[in-house]
Amino acid sequence: MLDLRIQQHFIDSADLHYQVADGLAKPVDAAVQAVLACVTGGGKVLTAGLGASAGLAQYLAGLLVGGFERERPGLSAMALSADAQMATLWPEEQGLASQVRALGHTGDVLFLISSQGSENAMVQAVQAAHERDMSVVALTGHQGGALARQLRETDVHVCVPHERVARIREVQQLVLHCLCDGIDTQLLGEQESY
């Protein structure tokens, strides 16, 4: 009964992936270069997100430390915590910013993931990163919201221009895979097709 509806989800997702591929290639490449400059220069990548985006942030940190599709030494990365225990230590909006101030240093990258970019906690995290002379990579959806407006010219904004959160997250996961593949290609060279 739901066959056609399910098929439509696949079609809609594939269509969006195809539509945004050209527009996202350059910002994803810029994100690769920012992360690569950070980790090869002795810095670390702090990843963060709220809600479901926190899961993607943890996933990215895991891929950077543990590798993507090829063996390589681990890269210095960690996911900032947005869980309930940490939330009791600071007011909700200050939690990520407090962690950035405690763990971030000049030359590090703060990699934020948000479907909308409207969360005040993310905006405060960007401000904290800038205070620490860190670069910011923001992976957002919609138009990037207040988060995008906080970015500097030297930061990187990868924005999935879509309104549906499910579709945004699907593309964001592919962006993370492209990022990790780009890093591996830069570090290890081209790999033959699979």
For the regions a language model picked out, list residue spans one by one.
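Short, glycine/polar-rich helix-capping loops at beta-to-alpha or helix-loop-helix junctions
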Residues: 139-154
